[in-house]
Amino acid sequence: MSELSNIKTLEELFEYWKTKQSNDSGKETCNSENGYVVATNSFYKDGIVNPEEYQNSALKVLFITNEVSIDCKNDVDEKNPELKGNGKGGHLVGNNKGNTVCSFNRYISDDEQETWSGKMRIKFGEMYRIMTEENYKTKDSIDAKANKEALKKIAFMNLNKRGGFGSIQRDVFLNYLKKYKECIRKEIELIAPDVIVWCACNTYDAEEYMGAIFEEKVWKEKKLTLKKGKVPILRMWHPSVQ
């Protein structure tokens, strides 16, 4: 029996996943660029933004993107000696206590401005409203309040929990997906969405990477079979695309 079969919550999964990552050499699964190497124990939690709102929402939507873009100026070993890995004479980067759900909630509560590439959080809120509001109409200006209310009802996950440098390093990313595919599947199962929005049209070969996680027929049918039944997968442009 898989160790994952006994895991019942996202928090339990993330602890298991992070420990497994930390014990991985990272040789084939950690991004590196310009003297920076992603730490093996770098881990950005994600998941359900507001569990109560999500469970009570008319449509449970999970947005999936590839990986966090690491801030190498601030999330670096010089400022965080707890980062582990092989810096290869350069610097380890990442965040061993990262949490994108906290970032969503800081934005919702006006404690943080929208600084994500392409105004991602704004666009996720807009996407959710387009999918769920019967009389939704595009306006010249964004309804920030309505969008923030919408964000409370979504779930969000990155596939590569370590993070990267803003553009996919194909081989490393593919190796990561293959190595941690059971964890990725488990997270989706625990989130239990009604619809998956795969934000991938312009960032990587979705068919290849989808195939590394799921059986080929899943992508061809555009439906993922969970305990609750078949869940449709919508493929959209990544929110950072202008």
Each predicted region: which residue ranges?
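A polyanion-binding, active-site-adjacent surface
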Residues: 2-191, 195, 201
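C-terminal capping/extension of enzyme domains
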Residues: 1-15, 170-185, 203-242
